[in-house]
Amino acid sequence: MKETKVQNTIAGAKGITFSGDTFVVPETHDMVKTLFDPMVRKSYCEMIILLILAANGLVFWLINNNTLRIETFIGLYIFWRLSYNFGIGYLLNVQSNHHRLVKWARKAQVFKKNGSLVSRLAEKEIKSQMGPEYDVQKYPIEFNTWLLFRKVVDLILMSDFTTFICLVVVCAINKDYQFINSDQQEVWLISTRLILGTVLILFNLWVKVNAHNTIKDYAWYWGDFFFRQINNEDLIFDGVFEMVPHPMYSVGYVGYYGFAIISKSYTILTVAIFGHFLQMIFLHYIENPHIDKIYGPSGNEADIEMLLKLKDLRHFDNIKPLVGLLNFTWLRASDMTNLIMVGTYSFTIPYLASLVDTVRVGETGVNPGTILFILTIVIKVFESLSINILLILQSYYKTFTKWYLSNDISVEKTLNNWSIMYNSLISLTYSSFFGLNFYHVLIGLESDKLFINSWVYLRIFLGILLVFTQVWINSSIIDSIGYFGWFYGDFFIPKTSQQKAHLTKAGVYRYLNNPEQIFGVCGIMGVTLIIPSLENLICCVLWVTNNFIRINFIEKAHMIKIYGEREVMKDSGVTKTFKKHLIPGAIQRRLSKGSEDNSDLLNQHRRKSTIMAGATDSLDNFIKELKNTNTRLTKQNILELSQNLYFENSDYKLVIKNLNTTENNLSTAFIGEPIEVEWKAPENHSPKDWIGLYKTVQTTYSRYKTLISSSDRWTQVTSDSGSYVFEGEKLFWEEGIYEFRYHLDGKHDVAYISEPFELTSANIEVPPSTEGSIVLANELKAKVFDRAIVGFGSIDSPIDSAVQKSGSIIQTYNRLAYVISKSTGIHINAKVFLYADNEDELTVHKLSLKLINIRKVLDDLSHAHYPLSEEKKEE
């Protein structure tokens, strides 16, 4: 029962065995329909299964003593649960690793027409399942073995569930129908239990139904242990599988806890925990290894993933950094310091405090518990303010990095030192909180100081569950984004081409965008639930508030600056699933209306409303796709696709001058070309109005408010109408789709958005011989160097001398390398300029000779005789 990509197990689906035999998979039915639908024929095994299930009712009727009933059904449930997790687990394990079930069937000649009792029984059973027209000999032995294995699964799984339900019933009616006895519990509590339990059961039912609709019988019965379905190479994450990892084993068991709540029985709760625990063992040792073997990465991919994890450690002196006390190393000074600190605040101080009744503060005696509480609050407030302020200063002003560089410490060292500081402060807060509660345990909990005194075992169970959830979530986060992400590496290390250009959507981030927002502090909630005192409640509120502020107002803002709105605000799996099931389909399908001439194209590419913008392609990608089509769009269509018609009747206007128009009616300009924008505003407009230049792919999510910085690509609106030329540092120096935005009153509220336009590279053809070097040099100078460097000299002027006069040497070299690579189709690195044999003597003319030589070498290697510029166009 796994998240397997499968079309269906109906006629027409193609199957292939592990030995290479292909076949058409016939129709099969799910467990419930097979057993309980009177319209579906019953096999001999299925009739036996129904009799065994009915026998549970006979056990209930024959045993009059309810205590004996409970003990009997506990024994039966344990038997069937062990049969499931260890019996079926063993069969699947030997089948996965050795194809043992198929070998047994082949050795016993189960499906041979030899007249033996075994073969006749097997044939009758399969034909009673599949119909008399089913020919056992025409199908692979693997598929027939799977059909018989399904009956074993049906027997064990249905018996497991039936005995559990019988146990729920006998526990619920115990002690004079305790689950609804108003003499034992108040009516409002009974009603709350029944409603909550029913909700959990219905949710569990939805999970099971949705899971089966997604994975079908093939994966429900572990079909890929026996054969594969063709075009079924990847796991699928859809429906409930997009909400939580392994839903059949995680939230697929919440119904068990719902039954425990309804029955008001700790016996049922204990049995549910026992069954769920065994199921997780089954997942870890049987299910996951097979998933990794069948759907996991290849050997090379696994090696690459391991190398990436090792490279993640280069910022931490190539040793896993300390997270809490995880990765502790005796020979690392910071680890020893953390160990002493954690031990002191968690155990030593609370123990010493428990030895005294009061602590003298001046003339007043103060309870040690009060001092520990104040200490915990002070430490948490200090950690919250210091970490948050440092992250803000680092995000906007690079304060942390600048200090290290000013002291001749490399950038790579900043993240390692930050990780030590961050982990020490976090460990200090948790140690002080633990110490506060440890002190109260040592002196004995006073019931009058607790909000809740009842349901002790339930509180302990839920509290421990929340603590383990936080530990699991934190480990999943580190596994997904590495230590670099855990310690806010994006704040400290500049993003390079080697780093990921997109935020990860693997692991726990497939289901939640910010899993740490709630689950990152649920351990504190768990401790508060176990010891529900006012002190713990205040601490819990403080933890949750700080976590919310740090993630939503500091981390998210920085991620938007680095990766853009579109990347940060993608819907998580849970959000997608809730939208799919809660938002009416008519709203989801509503698209902008387009012209009749382009209706097919617009229906395919048009953006949805702003609410659903997260599920659409960017205008940037759309225009790139448009280049490969023969469809012509009008400027009106382009404006409509970009959602700029929102401002059609605005009193504010922006018009971009001197743009080129392609045959697809797209407005373009060459990288580095000055761009003049004219504005028109009402007479009473604010003198603080301003115009900024943005990349559309980073502003897709908000057409009325700009959420990212203009990075100094802006100008003040000084009059009711006028124009301004964006050039040099005011421009973007990379290809893409861009737009100008008119903002109001010095803020980021948008009054008008210009038509989108594309920045492209000029087409410069590199000649095949040095005879054309002068022409190439002049073209490079005119289309690249004159635009990138103000006042550039001749083609024989040293490039380095001109670059030295620019604002940023490295940035200028990177721009030159990028534009030349895009324009010529020959990739060069900034190292061409930085590591030249004699930087002072490198000229545009000599650079053109280098390009011609590179082109010649590439042509010789590829035996190609077409111009590189033509190849570039095709790309």
Swiss-Prot record:
Catalytic activity line of the entry: a 1,2-diacyl-sn-glycero-3-phosphoethanolamine + S-adenosyl-L-methionine = a 1,2-diacyl-sn-glycero-3-phospho-N-methylethanolamine + S-adenosyl-L-homocysteine + H(+)
Domain of life assignment: Eukaryota
GO MF term list: phosphatidylethanolamine N-methyltransferase activity
Recorded metabolic or biological pathway in which this protein acts: Phospholipid metabolism; phosphatidylcholine biosynthesis
Topology within the bilayer: Multi-pass membrane protein
Gene3D superfamilies: 1.20.120.1630, 2.60.40.2840
EC number(s) from the headed UniProt entry: 2.1.1.17
Top EC group: transferase
Lumenal side: 1-42, 93-152, 208-242, 287-338, 392-424, 481-517
Gene Ontology terms: biological process: methylation; phosphatidylcholine biosynthetic process
Compartments reported by the entry: Endoplasmic reticulum membrane
Broad class of the protein's primary localization: endoplasmic reticulum
Listed transmembrane segments: 43-63, 72-92, 153-173, 187-207, 243-263, 266-286, 339-359, 371-391, 425-445, 460-480, 518-538
One cellular-component annotation, GO: endoplasmic reticulum membrane
Keyword annotations of the record: Endoplasmic reticulum, Lipid biosynthesis, Lipid metabolism, Membrane, Methyltransferase, Phospholipid biosynthesis, Phospholipid metabolism, S-adenosyl-L-methionine, Transferase, Transmembrane, Transmembrane helix
Pfam families: PEMT, SKICH
Cytoplasmic side: 64-71, 174-186, 264-265, 360-370, 446-459, 539-875
Task of the protein: Catalyzes the first step of the methylation pathway of phosphatidylcholine biosynthesis, the SAM-dependent methylation of phosphatidylethanolamine (PE) to phosphatidylmonomethylethanolamine (PMME).
Family recorded in the similarity comment: Belongs to the class VI-like SAM-binding methyltransferase superfamily. CHO2 family.
PANTHER family linked: PHOSPHATIDYLETHANOLAMINE N-METHYLTRANSFERASE
Name listed for the protein in its UniProt record: Phosphatidylethanolamine N-methyltransferase
Species whose genome carries this gene: Debaryomyces hansenii (strain ATCC 36239 / CBS 767 / BCRC 21394 / JCM 1990 / NBRC 0083 / IGC 2968)
Source organism phylogeny: Eukaryota, Fungi, Dikarya, Ascomycota, Saccharomycotina
